[in-house]
Amino acid sequence: MAFAGILKDAEVAAALEACKSAGSFDHTKFFKSCGLAGKSSDDVKKAFGIIDQDQSDFIEEEELKLFLQNFSASARALSDAETKAFLKAGDSDGDGKIGVDEFAAMVKA
């Protein structure tokens, strides 16, 4: 698991189960239920690095669409509406992507 040493498998599994239906993803609930919201800044930055698949120092819309698959390869892709809502929630400077500080603020919100 990509998040071994950061998150507990059981918490990740429960978080994924809670949003397995299309349209049910809520980033705030997910970050809390998987345990990321309670982690240190360093752990949140490590998580950002895993989600930032192309290592551009930003999480772009396509990476957000596949967000859940970072936690489990069998997880679903987010719908376009979920992806856009997730991006809007995290993109505080309006540049169309989420930087590490924006991600940390969203996780801790």
From Swiss-Prot:
One of its GO terms (cellular component) is cytoplasm. The keyword Calcium applies. It comes from the Eukaryota. The modification N-acetylalanine is found at residue 2. Coiled coil: none annotated. The keyword Membrane does not apply. Pfam families: EF-hand_7. InterPro entries: EF-hand-dom_pair, EF_Hand_1_Ca_BS, EF_hand_dom, Parvalbumin. Ca(2+) 2 binds at residues 91, 93, 95, 97, 102. Keywords: Acetylation, Allergen, Calcium, Metal-binding, Muscle protein, Repeat. Ca(2+) 1 binds at residues 52, 54, 56, 58, 60, 63. Residues 39-74, 78-109 form the EF-hand domain. GO terms for molecular function: calcium ion binding. Gene3D superfamilies: EF-hand. In muscle, parvalbumin is thought to be involved in relaxation after contraction. It binds two calcium ions. Belongs to the parvalbumin family. PANTHER family: PARVALBUMIN (PTHR11653:SF12), PARVALBUMIN ALPHA (PTHR11653). This is Parvalbumin beta-2. The lineage of its organism: Eukaryota, Metazoa, Chordata, Craniata, Vertebrata.
